[in-house]
Structures are given as C-alpha cells and as structure tokens.
Amino acid sequence: MAKFEGYSEKQKSHQQYFVYPLLFQEYIYAFAHDYVLNGSEPVEIFGCNTKKFSSLLVKRLIIRMYQQNFWINSVNHPNQDRLLDHSNHFYSEFYSQILSEGFAIVVEIPFSLGQLSCPEEKEIPKFQNLRSIHSIFPFLEDKFLHLHYLSHIEIPYPIHFEILVQLLEYRIQDVPSLHLLRFFLNYYSNWNSLITSMKSIFLLKKENKRLSRFLYNSYVSEYEFFLLFLRKQSSCLRLTSSRTFLERIHFSRKMEHFGVMYPGFFRKTIWFFMDPLMHYVRYQRKVILASKGTLLLKKKWKSYLVNFSQYFFSFWTQPQRIRLNQLTNSCFDFLGYRSNVPINTFLVRNQMLENFILIDTRMKKFDTTAPGTPLIGSLAKAQFCTGSGHPISKPIWTDLSDWDILDRFGRICRNLFHYHSGSSKKQTLYRLKYILRLSCARTLARKHKSTVRTFMQRLGSVFLEEFFTEEEQVFSLMFAKTTHFSFHGSHSERIWYLDIIRIDDLVNPLTLN
C-alpha cells in the first residue's frame, strides 16, 4: 500500500483549477462552434443551419445564467422536455447544446494544462505516425508471435454517473462545475431516456459527443491507471515513460476501501501477477491482454479484473466479457480485422556469401484478413445490398447529380480498400467492390428510369472501372520497378498506412459489437 500511495502521490496535481467562471465568457462558445464545424463528425442542431453562429443568442444565454432562478427552475422541474426556455423548442435545444459544448471545452482545460506542465513530456519524442490506427498492427505482428495466451476484454460501461463525477473531482475542485455536470447528466437522463433508470450513463445524444467522449476517456484512464501501476511493479524491466490522461489526489483513499471489501487482495497483487511479457492494447472498449505465461496466470488476471471492477467502480462485470484463448488455436477481431497466428509455420531462406551459406528458418506468421460477413452486414445496414450480399439501389441518392453519385460510391470503395490494405486475402474486398459498383449502376439506372444493361451500354463500363481502380493503378505504377505488384494478380500483399487516424464509417460499427 505504501508503494501505491507513493506512486499515486507523484501523479496528483497540487494546483487547483476553477473553470466555472469561464462559462460566462462569450469566446468559449465561439470555440465550441468552431469545433463543431471543423470536427470530423459534424453536428446538426435539430435541422437549423450550424454554419451560422449567433453571438446575440449566446449573449442572451450568458445574461440568463446570471439570473438567480436560471438553474432553479430546471432543477425543480426535472421532467420537463425542454431546458432554459420552455416556451420555445428551438431556443431550448440551442441553449442546451451550446452550453454543454462550451462546458466540455471548459472542463478539458485543466487536463490540457497538466500535460503542458509535465516535465517528462519534453523527453518523449513526438512521432506523428504513432497516431495511425495501422501502427498497432506492426506492433502486434512483432510481439504476438512469441506469446501463448490472449484475453479479450470489454471495458465495463455504462457505470453510475455519480462515479464519473467523482473521477473529475481529482482535477476540478470548483463545486459549481461538478454540480453543472450532475445537472447535465440528470437532464439527459430524463430526455428520451438516454440514461437508464439506474442512472448509469450509456450514451449522450450525438449533439453532445464531445462531452460524452470526455467523460468516457476520464473513466477509461481511471480504469487503466491501476493496471499501469501493477505493470510497473510486476515488470523486471523499466517501462517507457508514459503519462496517464487523468491525475488524482485521493486515489489511495479509494484503495483502502477496496482493501476492506476484499481483505488482503491488494497485498498479494504484486507477486500474484508477475509476468514480464504482458502486452496491453486497447481501442475504444476493446482490450487485448497477451502473455507468454501459463493458463493459470491468465485465469488469475481474469479473476482480478472482475473483482477490480466490482469493488473499485461498484460495477458488476460479467465474467463472460473476458475471454481466454490460445493464440495458435483461435482468431480475434480487432479494429475491423480478423487476426490469428496459424499453427503452420512458413519457411524463410536466407543466403549469405553468394549462396555459399544457406539458412532455412521456420517462422510463425501473424495473419490479418478482412471479415467478409460483418462487412457485408455493414453494407446491408447502409442499404447498399441485401443481407445475403445482393446489390440494390440507393434511392435516397437519386436526387444527386451523376457525378456526385459516382463520387460517393467511389469514395466508399477507395476507403474500404485503403483501410483494409493490410488484409492478406483480397477476395473479400473485391466482392465488396462488386457490390458497390453494381449498386452504383442500379442507382444511376433508377435515377434515369432505365435498366442497368441499357444504362451500362450507354455509359460504358470502362468509366466505372477506371473510377474505382484509380488507386490500384497508382500503386501498380509505384511498385512496377521493384516488384510484380498487382491488386488483381496477388492477394497476399499487405500494406499498413500511417495516415489513417480514424476507423472507416462502415468498419466502426464492427468495433463496437
């Protein structure tokens, strides 16, 4: 316990931040509006034009916030469907959204200041390529070949919203901000039942995605903080310096409560999980723990994680959410790829001194493929095909111009090929390409009230083929002088791009299931 208190003491912040007064500054809401416009996922305010920022409405909001009965009416009428202005639906929803977006920016300020003041950050080199999602797979390919067991973990969520508020108390000490956060959570819990009757936050409305992400990141960082501490204590090697997202000042007090609920659990933890070859990878709620240890050790980790969630977060974790598998006998889905380590090894021949010395080495292979059935299911959900993969037209796009229709279908196809370029088997991608191409042709034929055959004869299939294979032709020119590279002739080349920083829209639902 003393070691943990010392570790927790290093992480805590001695400076208090009072951010509530910033909510009365007009520029905060201008920043929130700019984030909505420049973000990768735009937000619509109930059909109104988000490109217009009304400073007059913001000034009215600030004036209302100075009034004494501003929050009292809302608190005394929690079952009302509208906030701030019950007589006008537009103003009510505009005020609630712009206020929640501004609040999300304000509460992020202490964490940003803490990162800027961290002396260790200057010693850590900045590698922009590490932001890429594809940078995870070379790491898996390098490390997982030597490991034995794999644990699939789903981080328990939702949890009681009061726990989320308590997590922020370690960095935000002004009481009004915490009460305002409670107000938002209660407000959205009564609006369309976005939070369950048990008052556990699951998903905020998409209009408040920034606040939802901030709360979720705070929760996940707390979840990972203790795992990082155990990893440092159980490892025989010094870990690379890393900084957690959330610092805390009363973390040891929670651990004392944790120890009372489960006597002796913490004291045995250090030697209980000694494993110098433990690797941890997470994206969103999906977590992978890989180890070279025994099956008994992995079962101990599973037991620990279940009890940790129950006694520390007051959340019951279903044991079936943590699955144990042997790497050589199973495959796992991660970031839209289906990965496994086949039992059969492949031969690598090395030659030295002009073929005088030949060395044959048997090596394992980390195989990654694009899952066909889930991707076809995503296309079916987006109404590009049926559940069995039969292409259909896209009626809602028939009002667009021919070029816009071709551009949308072509962009979707290129994005799929680009994201799944690391797949060792391209047959699935070519099937998806066929579905999108025929769906595009049927959409254009439906727009012009013609048959697909008649439309294709008039337009010609060459244009569609060149449109969809533009990226393939570029790669064939790039690799023409060095290797016999062809998307159509080979299905085993894998390319990991370091410019992909977000999951494709059709792939993202697969990562949440």
Curated annotation (Swiss-Prot):
Pfam family, one: Intron_maturas2
Any one GO MF annotation of this record: RNA binding
UniProt family annotation: Belongs to the intron maturase 2 family. MatK subfamily.
Gene Ontology biological process terms from the UniProt entry: mRNA processing; RNA splicing; tRNA processing
The keyword Endoplasmic reticulum belongs to this UniProt entry's keyword annotation: no
Native organism taxonomy: Eukaryota, Viridiplantae, Streptophyta, Embryophyta, Tracheophyta
Function: Usually encoded in the trnK tRNA gene intron. Probably assists in splicing its own and other chloroplast group II introns.
Name this protein carries in UniProt: Maturase K
Location relative to the cell: Plastid, Chloroplast
